[in-house]
Design a protein with these regions (language model features):
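Internal alpha-helical scaffold of NAD(P)-dependent oxidoreductase catalytic cores
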Residues: 67, 78, 106, 110-118, ...
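Short, conserved active-site loop motifs that form the nucleotide-linked donor/cofactor pocket
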Residues: 42-44, 161
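Rossmann-like NAD(P)(H) cofactor-binding subdomain of soluble oxidoreductases
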Residues: 39, 46-54, 58-61, 65-136, ...
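NAD(P)-binding Rossmann-fold cofactor-contacting core
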Residues: 7-37
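Electropositive phosphate-/nucleotide-binding environments in soluble metabolic enzymes
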Residues: 14, 18, 46, 62-65, ...
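Alpha-helix C-terminal capping/helix-to-coil transition sites in glycosyltransferase folds
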Residues: 54-55, 178, 230
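NAD(P)-dependent Rossmann-like dehydrogenase/reductase catalytic/cofactor-binding core
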Residues: 186-190, 215-225, 229-292
Length: 292
């Protein structure tokens, strides 16, 4: 099966909810998460993880941070009994609570190195609904092995989706995770009625503290002026599509954390990441006043 929408790849989606999988398979829509979008008929959905992994050459993790470790453990169990050795890619933006680990570190702890080719981070300013509509989008693929990043670039690129490559996994992941915190602040400013001057100050000073933390952890400073740094920060802080912006906006209006999650109905990574980043900043001696 081939589809120009999918760059010629067969795609199997795994999820936990039967009714969503059934809708994708039968109606080729996902009305809850992508309303108004017609999905390519070559996308197949399943709630059976083993069936999703069978014969897969590339595994793409797009999960809430809190689910990464448990799912990676299940994947590891399958791969240990298989000769597949797929390429792993993740597009999750967050830090693990308690350990403050980046997502790639969590995956590496759970899946033995001999069971996969490489692990690549795919990240950048990319609202899902815009990608699904084929709006122009650019992101970064990062891996210490540049050839693996270039392989992901070749797999995903097309006329509306462009991928740049680099080797700075730390910088790409930290920019992706920490910008969600600044987006919460941007939503708070909007909800409280502040204007563009305040927004500009927040984004600028937010980038400064993201960079300080990333550099402390070994990131390349230049990464933060790229797509996964300032690019992701701008799109998340200025768009009402952003769940983190929405959460901050509701926070300014007096909503509790529980009420915000109930209202948005999707994971708001910035809330959990904020606590992890705050603790990490204290441990590292890094000033992060917006996060605080």
């Amino acid at each position: 099966r081939r589809s120009s929408d999918l760059n010629g790849h067969e795609v199997v989606l795994w999820g936990r909810e039967d009714h969503i999988a059934d809708e994708i398979n039968q109606a080729h829509t996902n009305s809850h998460f992508l309303p108004g979008i017609n999905l390519p008929t070559t996308i197949v959905a399943t709630t059976d993880l083993k069936a999703a992994l069978d014969q897969a050459t590339v595994l793409l993790f797009v999960l809430p941070t809190k689910a990464i470790r448990s799912v990676a453990r299940q994947v590891a169990s399958y791969l240990s009994q298989s000769d597949a050795q797929p390429l792993l890619v993740h597009a999750t933006k967050g830090l693990e609570q308690g350990t403050h680990l980046r997502v790639s570190q969590m995956i590496e702890e759970e899946i033995p190195r001999q069971d996969y080719q490489d692990l690549v981070v795919l990240s950048g300013p990319s609202h899902a609904e815009e990608v699904a509509r084929h709006d122009l989008t650019t992101v970064t693929a990062a891996c210490p092995n540049l050839k693996a990043a270039e392989k992901v670039q070749a797999l995903f690129k097309n006329h509306y989706f462009r991928i740049y490559t680099n080797t700075d996994v730390v910088g790409v992941e930290m920019g992706a995770a920490l910008k969600n915190i600044i987006a919460l602040g941007a939503g708070v400013l909007a909800g409280a009625g502040y204007g563009d001057n305040a927004k500009a100050a927040l984004v600028t000073r937010g980038l400064a503290e993201i960079s300080r933390m990333g550099i402390k952890l070994g990131a390349d400073p230049l990464t933060f002026v790229g797509l996964s740094g300032v690019g992701d920060l701008v799109v998340t802080c200025t768009s009402p599509h952003s769940r983190n912006w929405q959460a901050g906006n509701l926070l300014a209006k007096g909503y509790s954390k529980e009420a915000i999650e109930e209202e948005i109905q999707m994971v708001v990574e910035g809330i959990a990441t904020c606590q992890s980043a705050y603790e990490l900043a204290k441990e590292s001696g890094i000033e992060m006043p917006i996060t605080e």
